[in-house]
Amino acid sequence: MFIPEPVATMLPDGSVRHPIITVCGSTRFKEELIAVVGELTHAGWLVFPVGVTDKSRVIDDAKKVLLNDIHQQKIRTSDAIYVVNKDGYIGESTANEIRYAQLWLRPVYYMEGGAEDGTNAERS
């Protein structure tokens, strides 16, 4: 599992700003989504997790739009996104999130594959 190294910055008041990362990926990988939040947090990232991983819950179209809007706001607020792409799988929603992050010039890191630009690219 690739975990990117965060770069914290010192603020004028002496406090530290930890970089923010949004986790993206299919809810079929619930265990991996939960595990990666812990790994990223321990590495020093402030993590926005996937908001809903309970596949048994029925979500109507209006709620899907709301949840998508919230997730896009997480991406805009973040310094980067982290894609849980177990066995190379990236579904349609996750692909859309990657494109959205790229539109906002956010670096994209992959659980399997490292960084989008190839830096620190390593496989577990």
Residue ranges of each PLM-predicted region?
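Conserved catalytic or regulatory cores that recognize and/or transform ribose-phosphate-containing ligands
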Residues: M1-S124
